């Protein structure tokens, strides 16, 4: 180190000074002077080498610091990018969870509606079955014919009511409304009590009695 060289130089100066004080002749003085110059020159050369080594060490240290700084910067950038990626993944995960929940809700709603429709279809099929049974019964006994017409309506046609004209038709239309209740319309000839008959069949669900009452009402129009 430079401090060691300076200490060595101080030691050389002290030795030279001690020799100088004990020297009397001019020849010896000249020899000491040359020795002193050589010592100074050698020390200067060693000091120069040491200083260059110290400068090189400082440069290497600074370069090492710069490398560490660059590495730290790269590490921080990678860390920031990783945190950003993690945040994006979490966001996508939350979106996926919301989407999955929405899909599940839609599936459950579809299942409920499907069940409701299935139940309604079964109820309608049962009603139509009862209607067909009643129709078959009344077709033979009361001359009743049932036709399916526009708008999902059924048309009921009675014959054998007018003794003077047995083939003369007496008819009305029937369908199920949005509330799945019977709704009667388009009677020919017009019946005043049709609305009352409709209300009764909605309450009792006795369709056979409904048809019998309508036929009686049509028969009454013939004799009135």
Curated annotation (Swiss-Prot):
**Which key words tag this protein in UniProt?**
Cell cycle, Cell division, Centromere, Chromosome, Coiled coil, Kinetochore, Mitosis, Nucleus, Phosphoprotein
Give a GO cellular-component term. nucleus
Asked whether the UniProt record includes Cell inner membrane among its keywords, one would answer no
Where, if anywhere, are coiled coils annotated?
61-142
Q: A Gene Ontology biological process annotation?
A: mitotic spindle organization
Keyword Disulfide bond assigned = no
| Pfam families (UniProt xref) | Spindle_Spc25
Where does the source fall among the domains of life?
A: Eukaryota
Chain spans, region Interaction with the N-terminus of SPBC24 = 1-144
Query: Region annotation Interaction with the C-terminus of SPBC24: residue ranges?
Result: 145-224
In which compartments does the protein localize?
Nucleus; Chromosome, Centromere, Kinetochore
Protein's job: Acts as a component of the essential kinetochore-associated NDC80 complex, which is required for chromosome segregation and spindle checkpoint activity. Required for kinetochore integrity and the organization of stable microtubule binding sites in the outer plate of the kinetochore. The NDC80 complex synergistically enhances the affinity of the SKA1 complex for microtubules and may allow the NDC80 complex to track depolymerizing microtubules.
Q: Tell me the protein family, please.
A: Belongs to the SPC25 family.
Question: Quaternary state and partners of this protein?
Answer: Component of the NDC80 complex, which consists of NDC80/HEC1, CDCA1, SPBC24 and SPBC25. The NDC80 complex is formed by two subcomplexes composed of NDC80/HEC1-CDCA1 and SPBC24-SPBC25. Each subcomplex is formed by parallel interactions through the coiled-coil domains of individual subunits. Formation of a tetrameric complex is mediated by interactions between the C-terminal regions of both subunits of the NDC80/HEC1-CDCA1 subcomplex and the N-terminal regions of both subunits of the SPBC24-SPBC25 complex.
Q: What is this protein called?
A: Kinetochore protein Spc25
Species this protein is from: Homo sapiens
């Amino acid at each position: 180190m430079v401090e060691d060289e300076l200490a060595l130089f101080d030691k050389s100066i002290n030795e030279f000074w001690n020799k100088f004080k004990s020297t009397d002749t001019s020849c010896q003085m000249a020899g000491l002077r040359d020795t002193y110059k050589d010592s100074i020159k050698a020390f200067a050369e060693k000091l120069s080498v040491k200083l260059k080594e110290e400068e090189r060490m400082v440069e290497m240290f600074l370069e090492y610091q710069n490398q560490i700084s660059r590495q730290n910067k790269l590490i921080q950038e990678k860390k920031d990018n990783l945190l950003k990626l993690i945040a994006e993944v979490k966001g996508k995960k939350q979106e996926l969870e919301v989407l999955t929940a929405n899909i599940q809700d839609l599936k459950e709603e579809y299942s409920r509606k499907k069940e409701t429709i299935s139940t309604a279809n079964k109820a309608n099929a049962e009603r139509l079955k009862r209607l067909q049974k009643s129709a078959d019964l009344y077709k033979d006994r009361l001359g009743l014919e049932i036709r399916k017409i526009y708008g999902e309506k059924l048309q009921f046609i009675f014959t054998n009511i007018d003794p003077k004209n047995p083939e003369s038709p007496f008819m009305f239309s029937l369908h199920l409304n949005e509330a799945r209740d019977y709704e009667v319309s388009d009677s020919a000839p017009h019946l005043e009590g049709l609305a009352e008959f409709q209300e009764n069949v909605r309450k009792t669900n006795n369709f056979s009695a409904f048809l019998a009452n309508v036929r009686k009402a049509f028969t009454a129009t013939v004799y009135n």
